[in-house]
Amino acid sequence: MNNTIISMKEKELRFLKFFHQQKYNVVDFNLIEELDWRRLTHEDLQQMDERSFWQQNKSIYALRNDFTDQLFRYYSNYPTHLKKVAYAGDIIRDNRVIKQVGIENYEPQFDNITQNFLDFQYFIQNVLHDDIQFVILGHYQLIDALLEKNHQTREVMEMIEERNLSGLIQKLTFNHPIIQILKENTLNQLKILSHYLPERHPAMVAIQSWAQWFTDHGITEIHLDVTAQAPRSYYKGIFIKCHLKNTTHSVLTGGYYHGSLEGFGLGLTL
């Protein structure tokens, strides 16, 4: 038990030290987030179903369940001059404490965020002694690009999320692009996608750019996910999920967001 605790703390510390050396600003935020009712958006209130929270006097408090969301709220209210930050700590999900390390980049141009990825990959290889086995790519504009608004009912969206092909065929017909893509192996879906989206569509450009970049850097097992639906309204672009070779519970996830704050985040569960 002692060795496990020490090993975990060492990983967090080495993460922060390494990213500090790479010119990231190390930040530390309280696990307990004090929320101001006057500043909570409708979306913030909807998230309360996912969080452990309580009210004391006239204040409401909640346990952190996502670093990106916490930093997004904070820096939206209190703008920062920081361009890229690194963090390590606990998040609470489904009543479980999970260790997470990650970064946020507030200048999310492609060259910047691919360098962020290379920094993370170096940490995975040289500190965790692991490597990326395969990548899942997606884009939060894909559903809107492939599915007509009148078909975006709760029932259909749930079927897409569940990959319920038989149900979708009844709702959309067999020849619908969503069904034609989903019936393919996820390794082949990127090729199929090009049949249904113009090559200059923003989602297509982003996915193709990342797929080519990964291939150029030796990561060739790339799956497409057309089913993902944005967990927050400000998630509007590419998202990435990287599974590691040696550990099934550690997943590197990231994505682009743009609301009151623009950025790109990458987080790894330890």
From Swiss-Prot:
InterPro entries: aa-tRNA-synth_II/BPL/LPL, HisRS-like_core. It comes from the Bacteria. Gene3D superfamilies: Bira Bifunctional Protein, Domain 2 (3.30.930.10). GO terms for cellular component: cytoplasm. The keyword Amino-acid biosynthesis applies. GO terms for biological process: L-histidine biosynthetic process. SUPFAM superfamilies: Class II aaRS and biotin synthetases (SSF55681). It is found in: Cytoplasm. Belongs to the class-II aminoacyl-tRNA synthetase family. HisZ subfamily. Required for the first step of histidine biosynthesis. May allow the feedback regulation of ATP phosphoribosyltransferase activity by histidine. This is ATP phosphoribosyltransferase regulatory subunit. It comes from Staphylococcus epidermidis (strain ATCC 12228 / FDA PCI 1200).
